[in-house]
Amino acid sequence: MGLIKQLFTNCACPQGRMGRAMLKFMNLCHAPLTNWGLKLVNIQDGWTMLDIGCGGGATLQRLLKRSKDAQVYGIDISEESVAKAKKVNEEVLDKQVFDTQGSAEKQPYEDGKFDLVTAVETVYFWPNLPNCLQEVRRVLKSGGKFAIMVEVVDGDSMWTNVVEGMTAYSPEELKTMLDDAGFTQTEIHRMKPSNATIIGIKG
C-alpha cells in the first residue's frame, strides 16, 4: 500500500503513526469549513454541545470559543482520536470539555441533552446513517440544532476511490435524510461547489 493510500485509509478511524499524522492534517485543513459552518448556527452562551467524530479535537476548541460558559462533548470511534482531542483540550478537560470513545449510532448520552450537535467531515463513515441521524435527534433538546459540514459531494471519486469505507452524499441527499429522520427547517448552505453545511432542527 502506498504512503498516500495508508494516510487516507486513516480518515475513518485513525490509528498509529499514520493516524496521528492524519489527525494533525484534519485539525488544520478542516478549519475554514468548520469556522464558516459554525457562523451559520448562531451559537449562544451557555450551550451544551456535542461534536461527533471529533477527530483531533480542534472543533471542540472552536465550539468552546463561541459560547461563554459552554460545555462541549466529543465522541469518536478511534482511540487515537480521543487521546489527541484530550491532549489538545487538556487545560479544560473534564471541566468544560468532555471526550469519550464511542459510536455515532449508539451514544452514551441521555435524551435531550444538547443544544447543538455538529458533524464535520465525518458522516461519510457513519454506519447505517439513518439510524445515526435518529440517535442525533434523540440526544438533542427540543429546538436543538444539528449541523453537518462536508467538503465532498456525491460521485467525488477522487476521494471515494482512495479512502476505504467512504460514502459521499450530496447535500440534497443529506437534507432528505434529515427530513426523513424528523428534523424540521432543514437548510443547505454552500460556500463552494463542493463545500456545504446542512442544518436541521429538532422540532
Question: Language-model segments: which ranges?
Answer:
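Conserved beta-strand signature within the Rossmann-like core of class I S-adenosyl-L-methionine
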Residues: 144-150
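A short acidic, Gly/Pro-enriched loop at the edge of an enzyme's catalytic core
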Residues: 105-116
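A short SAM/SAH-binding and catalytic strip from SAM-dependent methyltransferases
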Residues: 116-129
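Core SAM-dependent methyltransferase catalytic element
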Residues: 182-184, 190-203
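Conserved alpha-helix/loop element of class I SAM-dependent methyltransferases that forms part
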Residues: 28-47, 62
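A short glycine-rich, Lys/Arg-flanked "PGG" loop and its adjoining helix->strand segment in the class I
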Residues: 130-142
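Short alpha-helix
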Residues: 166-181
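Class I SAM-dependent methyltransferase SAM/SAH-binding core
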Residues: 50-106
